[in-house]
Amino acid sequence: MMIMPEEGHPLSRMLASYPPQALRCDLPAGSLFGTDGIRGKAGDLLTAPFALQVGYWAGQVLQETAARRAPVIIGQDSRNSSDMLAMAIAAGLTASGLEVWHVGLCPTPCVSYLARTTDAIGGIMISASHNPPEDNGIKFFSDAGTKLLKDLSAKIEAGLRGDRLENILSQTNNCGSYQHQKELTQQYRNAVFATLPQGLSLDGLKIVLDLAWGASVHLAPELFQALGAEVIALHHQPDGNKINVNCGSTHIDQLQGAVQFHNADLGFAFDGDADRVIAVDNTGRIVDGDYILYLWGKQLQAAGQLPNNLIVGTVMANLGFERAWEKLGGQLHRTAVGDQYVQAAMWQTGAMLGGEQSGHILCHHHSVSGDGIQTALHLAALVREAGVPLNELIDQSFQTYPQFLKNVRVEDRDRRLNWQNCDVLQTEIAKAEAAMGDKGRVLVRASGTEPVIRVMVEAEEQYLAEYWTQHLVNVVQSHLG
């Protein structure tokens, strides 16, 4: 017989409308965890019963790892499904005996920060980052503010696959409590502010912010305005139907146009959960993560704050960036794509700066997670300190190699994840690499967050990069699609 929690508890409220048969989840084959937690279509894999089980087993694993009972932080982006998933996960966490502090709409790095600096034993963020509104995801953080290690994620998944929800609910005699604690986000706001140079003023700078209808809509404008900047905000309300749709860090066109129309000094585009940022200079030119790493790295190098002149990047980092950084006496350590791989390499090598071309930037002088808002503020501070427009700093940095990236949709999960077994594709990749020699490179990989295979080619000569990208795309479509 199922034992229900006391009336008014979030577990009771969430379960009230579910018949017992609806509380059963058929899990797909293969790992539930991708490169950034669990991600999928809301209402498909990501249902309330599934999220409740995730919360329960996450609670069990976090308690076992920390060897204590303490609160878990929950934050979320603005997607329509985020409220439902947050409450279901809160129900599961309280069913495991834990207290929940739900901070509501906030950037992912806010959850990381609060997990690290409060008495919490971990944090959970409900977001699918840059993905479209119909997707959602569940990201997990340890009490150190870092993404959960693979072995802990595996324990959560083992629990999900090993017990039925009815059995879990029969054990919920010792429920924890739920508190809405929106005010905790101010601690994160103050911490971001404290990382900036003392006395920094952005007075006189006109800055356009594309907030992507997401998690940065309140905090980013507030911080830039507090520093004296004139802020022009795009997509500046939380909207679960529009988050990331033709806006934000993966759709820069509107930001570029707004910077030019308003004669702004620079612009920043965040993704839905604000853990990444792409900048635009005063001419409307895109300033991606490679440029941000180069400029910030050069500043830290000059200040003696970049051990071994080392920056951690990924396999996507442009060759032009790498060779320019080497000319400054620096070294670039490449990892697989994913901010958790960048993070792991930074800990292993002692690097203080790392990130991705896509705009995930980590600076261990200030935080342990990628933080789009913090990165944007530091780039604005760098421009103010340099005393010249951002376009001049970019002109003096490096010339990128022409790089072409195309996504090929491959619905079959096994084919997608095991693309290396396609002999024809491997042969054609080898041909491309031989044709370009040391003047180009090929990268083919399965996305960890979307059902696509990404094909990237870069070369000194644009026609070579373009030709081989399309050729390899055709091969993927013919043999894997």
UniProtKB/Swiss-Prot annotation:
Protein name: Phosphoglucosamine mutase
Binding annotation for Mg(2+): 129, 271, 273, 275
Phosphoserine sites (modified residues): 129
Reaction(s) catalysed (UniProt annotation): alpha-D-glucosamine 1-phosphate = D-glucosamine 6-phosphate
Family membership: Belongs to the phosphohexose mutase family.
Broad class of enzyme this protein falls into: isomerase
Keywords: Isomerase, Magnesium, Metal-binding, Phosphoprotein
Source organism: Picosynechococcus sp. (strain ATCC 27264 / PCC 7002 / PR-6)
UniProt GO cellular component terms: cytosol
A GO BP entry: peptidoglycan biosynthetic process
Cofactor(s) listed: Mg(2+)
EC number: 5.4.2.10
Positions annotated as active site in the UniProt record: 129 (phosphoserine intermediate)
